[in-house]
């Protein structure tokens, strides 16, 4: 049995079946977590490098068992002049090592994507260092775009998609118990699969 077809009854029961097929240049991904499910739309047309990287982690099932481990709220960023609100997820360090090399930074000045509410973006240190960790914006976060002040290098982060179903799940994870920015306990990603 095709694993994607096996998910169809679950999607219908949860009300998560996409009402519209993904448009050209996009792919949809079902994320099942211990706090609820969401559907992501990955923009393969405008952010091809970042989207391809994310989807290869999905297809290799390296996000299965990964965790939303970080919640950044206005109140838990002491000493930070530019504050943001996001949740961040990624595989364990051991699983991440089985992943793929870092990718070039696709700047929002090139892709035209912006860090709006529900947008997906890659976590990074310096430019061209993103691998598996990603985050979801809670509210609009323009300081994460190219030229924004959150990262001192001003290069911004690579937005590559958005949550199209399940924003209440994002907000539940954002408000979950945390010690500083570390979710306690982390929210487990049971599985991530492409949708037809």
Task: Set out the residue ranges of the language-model regions.
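Sec-dependent signal peptide recognition
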Residues: 2-12
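Cyclophilin-like peptidyl-prolyl cis-trans isomerases
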Residues: 13-196
């Amino acid at each position: 049995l095709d694993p994607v077809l096996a998910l169809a009854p679950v999607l219908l029961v949860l009300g998560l079946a996409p009402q519209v097929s993904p448009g050209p240049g996009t792919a949809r991904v079902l994320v099942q977590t211990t706090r609820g499910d969401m559907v992501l739309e990955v923009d393969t047309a405008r952010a091809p490098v970042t989207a391809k990287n994310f989807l290869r982690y999905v297809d290799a099932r390296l996000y299965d068992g990964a965790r939303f481990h970080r919640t950044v709220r206005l109140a838990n960023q002491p000493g930070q002049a530019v504050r943001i609100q996001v949740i961040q997820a990624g595989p364990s360090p051991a699983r991440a090592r089985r992943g793929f090399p870092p990718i070039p930074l696709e700047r929002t000045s090139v892709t035209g994507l912006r860090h709006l509410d529900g947008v997906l973006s890659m976590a990074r240190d310096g430019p061209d260092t993103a691998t598996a960790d990603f985050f979801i914006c809670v509210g609009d976060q323009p300081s994460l775009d190219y030229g924004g002040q959150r990262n001192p290098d001003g290069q911004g982060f690579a937005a590559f998609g958005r949550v199209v179903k399940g924003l209440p799940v994002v907000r539940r994870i954002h408000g979950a118990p945390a010690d500083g920015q570390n979710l306690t306990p982390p929210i487990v990603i049971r599985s991530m699969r492409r949708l037809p």
